[in-house]
């Protein structure tokens, strides 16, 4: 992923200069560390679903699993360029098990054996009402650091992607990946595939870059607040 990042992403980065500039200014106080602000961080990125499990299906037929992996790949590029070690639960359109239970158990195993600082799981939302929209971040109700991470990412998504999004980071006690991982973990629902306009945006490469950058900046804000790295 690292080799040709600047060339491969240049066009999309130009489109995101406004939000990018804001995040670099946010880290400038760290001096030369701002060149690699994620140095020493280890992060697990989980692209939800995959293979036989397509996840949600959009109004135009887009499979959630494809969008999840696309955002994860872009986010991984940003994190690695920032100096982080990134561990992916999947790198292609493959499930991690033949059934949902074994698939989720393998994701948990990867996270818990990784020695990582955090886990970020990327998903897309859906709702019966086609009007529902906006990214939202979930954390486990018993994870204090998970809450801080979720709030940092939620605020970054609001300020860098959609200022009209009034959704707040939300606790959840039932999501498997949140309740079984031993490190701070969040699920980022990037938007609603049940909303035709938001589905169109989520399927757009430049918008995916914008989402990935906002999540990256939220993660960086978390590490600055927690002083983990």
Where are these regions (language model features)?
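Catalytic-site microenvironment of enzymes
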Residues: 1-229
